[in-house]
Amino acid sequence: MTRPVRSLREAASFVDRVGIALVFPRDGIPLPSLWEAVAGDQQVEWVIEKEDGTKDFSPEMERVWSWKDELPAQKRACAGKHLRGWATLVSLKVLPSLYALTGLHAREDGFRQTELSSLEREVAEAVLVLGPLSSPELRQAIGCEDTARVNRALDLLQRKLVLTKAGTVTQGQGWPAGTYDVLARRYKLGRLPDEEVARLDIARIINAPDAPTLARTTGWNKREAARIFGALA
């Protein structure tokens, strides 16, 4: 029986041990998840019903929901929609390899060399100049009231590893809002590995059973996934 993760320190150690983890599991994706690490081998509900009939997070879900934000806030792991747009946790030891696949320079303004939409560039520049911002703060900073468009730009910038989660900020009402920072500023990436070496590193961490699963997990095209999978055999 696997001992469940019970503290933020253990959650950080879990991410360091596996290299890349999803926050929640996905069918057909061989990566471990923080949820599974917290729940352990038991069948655990995400939501519980209280005596008054209202529903709330289970203790396990409370931990996952808090730690997914506390880990990046304390820089114990990189967090964001960095893999296929899924909420992902990346060990800081693995981050240089994942970042190397973007082709970006490891400096805070490295995104200026890549192709971005006008809104993506505006969002990235605002975060670069003003520091970590939430979506509402970003909308105010760039003068765009379209929540869906700004959130879409944030999602795409995370997938491109331009922006990353930096924690949360309390709002006047409702849930705390996630904040975002420039990834290459928030974390010291050092000297990036060669792209081919980085691709092999990421494939080893994923440890997919076959090339199609590797392609599905990474978003690489089928030919590239087959080539890398073959190189690992």
Predicted features and spans:
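Long, low-complexity intrinsically disordered regions
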Residues: M1-A233
